[in-house]
């Protein structure tokens, strides 16, 4: 349980510190999602409930689809702007 909380905090820290690079922001969001999935799996195993394991598989599937869509948008953004860095004004 502490490991998943630690991973979630690493994801938040990565998201906050890398606000100019979209790829690192996407990776940080994925780390946060996978840490929550890991927490659900640990809770499911401790309560001996298979529903949590099914829900974890669903979360991993949605996270994969989210990554694919995000990277597709990122490719379109790169073609439009020529760079993937975010510039705040």
Curated annotation (Swiss-Prot):
Q: List the disulfide bonds.
A: none
Report the InterPro entries cross-referenced here: NADH_UbQ_OxRdtase_chain4L/K, NUOK/Mnh_C1-like
What reaction gets catalysed by this protein? a ubiquinone + NADH + 5 H(+)(in) = a ubiquinol + NAD(+) + 4 H(+)(out)
Top enzyme category: translocase
Q: Does the keyword Protease feature in the UniProt annotation?
A: no
State the EC number(s): 7.1.1.2
Keywords linked to the UniProt accession: Electron transport, Membrane, Mitochondrion, NAD, Respiratory chain, Translocase, Transmembrane, Transmembrane helix, Transport, Ubiquinone
Tell me the GO molecular function terms.
NADH dehydrogenase (ubiquinone) activity
Q: Which GO terms describe its cellular component?
A: mitochondrial membrane; NADH dehydrogenase complex
Give its localization: Mitochondrion membrane
Sequence similarity: Belongs to the complex I subunit 4L family.
This chain's function reads:
Core subunit of the mitochondrial membrane respiratory chain NADH dehydrogenase (Complex I) that is believed to belong to the minimal assembly required for catalysis. Complex I functions in the transfer of electrons from NADH to the respiratory chain. The immediate electron acceptor for the enzyme is believed to be ubiquinone.
Record's protein name: NADH-ubiquinone oxidoreductase chain 4L
Q: Which organism is it from?
A: Aspergillus tubingensis
Query: What are the top taxonomic ranks of the organism?
Result: Eukaryota, Fungi, Dikarya, Ascomycota, Pezizomycotina
Gene that encodes the chain: nd4L
